[in-house]
Curated annotation (Swiss-Prot):
HAMAP family named in the record: Ribosomal_uL16 (MF_01342)
Name of the featured protein: Large ribosomal subunit protein uL16
GO BP annotations listed: translation
Biological function: Binds 23S rRNA and is also seen to make contacts with the A and possibly P site tRNAs.
Single annotated GO MF: structural constituent of ribosome
UniProt keyword annotation of Secreted present: no
Keywords on record: Ribonucleoprotein, Ribosomal protein, RNA-binding, rRNA-binding, tRNA-binding
Listed Basic residues bias regions: 1-19
Species the sequence originates in: Mycobacteroides abscessus (strain ATCC 19977 / DSM 44196 / CCUG 20993 / CIP 104536 / JCM 13569 / NCTC 13031 / TMC 1543 / L948)
Gene: rplP
Length: 138
């Protein structure tokens, strides 16, 4: 699972879901990529699930890059707890994703198989996304 090794503060404010991505909007390493079309918090489990879906489809011969990292903790209070008495304990680690951000990149010789693998990964994510290539970036 992807979680930070050490953080300065255990609990943080929730990141805002507004604006567009300022960096990481182009395919830099691979030939194909998954680009976010909306805002979302993507958890470490969802990132891992998408990575496994890609790797199982391409088997061998390709390389996958994960361009996001879940660096923000989201907290939750226990069920049936009264209001007050402080902030809840950290439950998940999330990556704050903005529109235009490239989430995954893939280098694979066969375009059709690469697109199928990335489509399977998109289905694992809680966000609308599209597949882009190195040539068709905006």
């Amino acid at each position: 699972m992807l979680i930070p090794r050490k953080v300065k503060h255990r609990k943080q404010h929730h990141p805002k879901k507004k604006g567009t991505a300022s960096g990481g909007t182009t395919v830099a390493f691979g030939d194909y990529g998954i680009q976010a079309l909306g805002h979302a918090y993507i958890t470490n489990r969802q990132i891992e699930s998408a990575r496994i879906a890609i790797n199982r489809h391409i088997k061998r011969g390709g390389k996958v890059w994960i361009n996001i990292f879940p660096d923000r903790p989201l907290t939750k209070k226990p069920a049936e707890t009264r209001m007050g008495s402080g902030k809840g304990s950290p439950e998940w680690w999330v990556a704050n994703v903005k529109p235009g951000r490239v989430l995954f990149e893939l280098s694979y010789p066969n375009e059709e198989t690469a697109r199928q693998a990335l489509t399977r990964a998109i289905h694992k994510l809680p966000i609308k996304a599209r597949i882009i290539t190195r040539e068709e970036q905006f």
